[in-house]
Amino acid sequence: MLFKNTLAYYNFSITYTQDYKNTPRLNTRVLHPSCKITSSLKKTQYLKSKVKHKMFFCTNMYSPQLNHVLQLVFDCNHIVPNSYQEITLKCRISSTKPGILFITDGTESETEDVLFDVQFLENTMTIKIKILPISRTVPVRIHLFSIPIYLPSPALEIDDINALCQKENIDPIVYEQYGLTNMPISTTNVINQFKVVSNDSVETSLILLNLSWTESPYQSQKLDRYGRKLLIVFSVFSIDTRKCSYWKNLFKSMIPLCRVNMISEPGISIYKIEFNDPFLTIFLRNVVLPENERRFPITKECYLRLTFSPPNRSTVTLNMNMPYFKICADGKSLEVFFPSDMSLVINTNKEITLRGKFTNKKIVGIFIPVQTHVFKLYPFLWFAQEPLKLRISCEKTVSVTEHDMLGRIFFVTKKLFRKPFRSLSNSDMKSLLTHTENTDKPFEVHFMGNCFPAYLLPELTLHPLEYEDKPARGNPQILPSVEKHSIIKMRI
């Protein structure tokens, strides 16, 4: 047989609310794996109920080798019968690989029994699992599994000291006309020279002649230090990479990273670079004073020196540089914001399409919305070469700005998520484990409209909780911890 039954015991901290004043807590001591301790949760004198409620906690870990998926089976009625109150479970967990930990609902019901949550798991960390306040006629099942992620990396790395910190919007019409074509796009004369500066990098020197500048009506107003209005214009040109004999061997179908080494004109900076094989499309930006062009003339010539290198294979390169996309501070995910200030009307579904894409077809993005009561937005899968389409609903009319975040995007391998998925409610984020005996893939995970073997996931481990100090005296709202043990069964 591939499986055998064993018992192990771990520490969990259980918190549930009897009323708004009294919050009893259960903390178990560190238990040896060979121990077996059974007890009941005793009510304190602050609680009205004098009945002892037994707690039963069972974890099932499915894998012929180690633990790839954790299943926690929790019978809430053993603590509070017919409870309509939220329960919080706390445990320590670790993974063999850094990734995103999914806390999913595995209960066989049509309602959302467990609050869906996503956390970045690295090393050993303490997580909280919330069981929602509903009538629980069956034991609640909680599925925990981790998926390795690809770190997002911008297609353009700007090292230009003249680059503006705030990016302006490019005219959508001009963007569609110029930014998404595979043909040379302007009359600008480009004299370029490629050379290999290292084993995996190519440096190009560009002399641009006859530059044509266009004003965008979709730009924010900027003033110089004297209060004079500045005009921002841009120019677009392309480079044919087939003229570089090293390009195809070094980068193949990958989108390279670009470093701006030098720009001859102080007022010019690079707004965006796109790579649509075999053409590199470069957007230049210039800042001028329209009422005094003689003093600040718009230059027709420019000299650039750029270095291209292949991206890190553990990252997914983003072919976008839009204001509403931002790589988060920890570099683990991509933050998505509203594209502009807008109003969301009550009981109306609004669809927002954000320009920008990534081209690595082996990667898929998982959109996780922010938790807010202002608008409703549900998780979905974002595939390569597709625009990001968001469907938002609101229970009341609200106004949002371009500084309001919509959610985060984590990038994972497409081996696990091959089919499109877009949830319509929180209950769509449930997960299911199926077992097939006498096969090489005994357990499969059904999640977000896809099915994948559990053994492809990193191994998870539960750890004992450290002893929690009792709260300081003088705080009437927090009761002392109730130190008792509970049955925790693990079946492998």
UniProtKB/Swiss-Prot annotation:
Q: Report the protein name in the record.
A: Uncharacterized protein U55
Origin species: Human herpesvirus 6B (strain Z29) (HHV-6 variant B)
